Amino acid sequence: SAELMKRAYNMGCDIENHSQSHPDMTKMTAEEIKAEIDFTSDKVEEAVGERPQFFRPPYIAVNQTMFDVIDMPFICGYGAEDYNNAIGVEERVEKVLAQARDGGIILLHDMNGNVQTVEALDKIIPALKEQGYEFVTITELFHAKGVAIDPDSEIIYSYAEQTEMYG
């Protein structure tokens, strides 16, 4: 909702684009993809006054049409499969900590009833801070690493300094 976006933005979060309806965009036409992305970017801009700079493809499903149409770098991240309720708190913690790396993007979900991720974060955040990691926005990460926010990169970034499509 617009209120949640404003609240997160005012707390210092980036508000990026993940689509309006979470479709498999590889099965959509260029026009359908553009409409999906523009709708969401327009809503974000209405809510917080800035357009998204990054796009996270639903299901991490991509094709060349998406790269051609979507004028933003694609991001993914390392996660804990926390969309799966069968994955418990400790396993979520272990997965995230095992994949942590300098410049890495952590992907976790805020979904209905997903209290296990909230509980896991209570352990993940202090553990990563103890290891010297800092938590920054995607935009701050790219700037800190000197990585251009290039909409034509055709990379799905899981870490900032990535140079191949998948990292």
Task: Name each region found by the language model.
Residues 3-10, 16, 20-134, 139-151:
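Catalytic domains of cell-wall/extracellular-matrix polysaccharide-remodeling enzymes
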